[in-house]
Amino acid sequence: MIRITSRSVKEAAGIRSVSSSTVRLNIAPKVVSPPVPPPVKPQGSEIPPPPPPPPLKAKRFSLFGFLFKTTLLATVVYGGTLYAATKNDKVMDFVIDKQLPFHEELIDLIENGSTEDLQEAWEQLKNKFTDVKLPTKDDIDELTQKLEHRGEDIIKETKKKIASTHIGHKSGTDLTPTEQLQRGVEIESVKKDVAHLPLIELNSDLGKSVDETVKQTITSFNNFIQSIDASSLATKDDKLITSINTSVNQLASRLNSLTKDFDNELQNKLKVSQTELFSSFTKKELELTENLLHQFSTEKQQLEAKLNQKLSQEIQAARAAISQAASNAVAMVRIEQTKNFEKLVSEKLNEERNGRLANLEKLNDRIVELEKFAEGFETQIVSNHKKAIIHQAVSKLKSLLLAPAAGDKPQPIKPYIDELTKIATDDEVLALAIKDLSPLITNESTHSILTNAQLLSRWEQLAPELRSASLLPPNAGLLGHLASIVFSKLLLPVKGVKEDGKDIESVIGRVESSLARGELDIAVEEAANLKGWSRKLANDWVVEGRKRLEIEFLLGLIESESKII
């Protein structure tokens, strides 16, 4: 049907060729003799020769090929990079830094993938292409309807083109000479009478078994042939129509056989699938029944367990509520009895108070006064006891620290400090004094605190070094030290005390005099006022003297505060 239409269109287009020319600047165009029309050969029983093959076209640029090659190259490079990343740490760092798309999934596939996974993916892809459904009868009907509509559209377009060609032919006798010169050369077609073309008919054995869609297609072909007969441009070609008729009969028989084969195959597949579906349905029904029975028994057991648990909880709650109500009732009875008893006792007491116990309030006031007196007396006794204990502890500490006996063994001081700390918890001054005293004598013994006599003897031992140090010049070297030692032997000791003397002999004399009189604070002050190397030599002696002064002051403070308590 399509071939006939295209050929008729070509013949209609080949009837005339119009050439036009224009008139420019009012110059008459050259008169060109009209070309001789080609001889029209009557179409008889001979088949026209096939058209010449089209010339080979030069290969053009293909966007699809370019995109395909580019995509293939990018895929190979990307996959090679990810594979190299699994083998090289530097490439892996590059991939992670650049955050290439889908690099984690692809690297995991490269590292953990196997041939079994590839085979499974290939089978899935293969199943997608093999599970192609055969075209159904409805699909075939739809295809034939589309072909029929397309043929009708082509017929309509052909008729329109033929009508336009007839309208375009206009006689040139009515035109002026100028218009005839300006008008293009026209070629008149030679018309011939064409006999009616034979219609397409099916064989008698295929007429009943052919589908309705094929019959409709044949009808449309016959309509098309009749339209060609009605046209004045058609030529007679019986062999072509006969070949078309034969081809249509063959197509009808082929379609009939394909339809029968398709129906038979469809019936066989339907039977097989029905059997398989019935067997699978039976198996699934049995499995579903077993699962339902199992679930039913499981749910039944769970419901029984939950029901028993709920009943036991409700029974326990009821028992607890009943026992609580009973205990509340008993408690209320006891409270009521207690109230009645208290009421009875209060009534009896009021009777006795108004009678024999009339002076009970006065006796109660006297007892309260006695209690207050006893509390005050007890407080005074406790404070006196504390005073006595503090006096004893302070006296013991003074005797051990400030005036120890030569034959006594050294004893730790910490137990006495702990005893004072326990007693002096209520007084803030005592607590602060003991707190300052503890770090001074906690790690000391009874013989580690130097007495005045020991300090005096140490000062006398330190005096020659102080004399030699006073003779040292600034930044003295070894020779200066040797010279100071020699010259210090030549110094004569000063007798008496010079109150205003600032030389080393005056200072040594004042310190010895103060230690002899028991004025340790003045002696420590004189030694602390030394300068230079002499002060560094006397530093240890000053530290020991200050420690003794601090201990004496804190013990005196504790003793004075204990008298005020």
UniProtKB/Swiss-Prot annotation:
User: What spans does the record annotate as topological domain Mitochondrial matrix, numbered to this chain?
Assistant: 26-62
Which residues face the membrane's Mitochondrial intermembrane side? 86-565
Q: Which organism is it from?
A: Candida albicans (strain WO-1)
Q: Carries keyword Transcription regulation?
A: no
Q: Where is the transit peptide?
A: 1-25
Keywords for the protein's UniProt record, in alphabetical order: Coiled coil, Membrane, Mitochondrion, Mitochondrion inner membrane, Transit peptide, Transmembrane, Transmembrane helix
Subunit structure, interactors included: Component of the mitochondrial contact site and cristae organizing system (MICOS) complex.
The record ties this protein, via InterPro entries, to:
MIC60 (IPR019133)
Its GO CC terms?
Answer: MICOS complex
Family from the record = Belongs to the MICOS complex subunit Mic60 family.
A GO BP entry: cristae formation
- What protein is this chain from? MICOS complex subunit MIC60
Q: Which residues form a coiled coil?
A: 282-381
For region Disordered, the annotated ranges are 34-54
Q: What job does this protein perform?
A: Component of the MICOS complex, a large protein complex of the mitochondrial inner membrane that plays crucial roles in the maintenance of crista junctions, inner membrane architecture, and formation of contact sites to the outer membrane. Plays a role in keeping cristae membranes connected to the inner boundary membrane. Also promotes protein import via the mitochondrial intermembrane space assembly (MIA) pathway.
Cellular localisation: Mitochondrion inner membrane
Record-annotated membrane-spanning stretches: 63-85
The annotated topology with respect to the bilayer is: Single-pass membrane protein
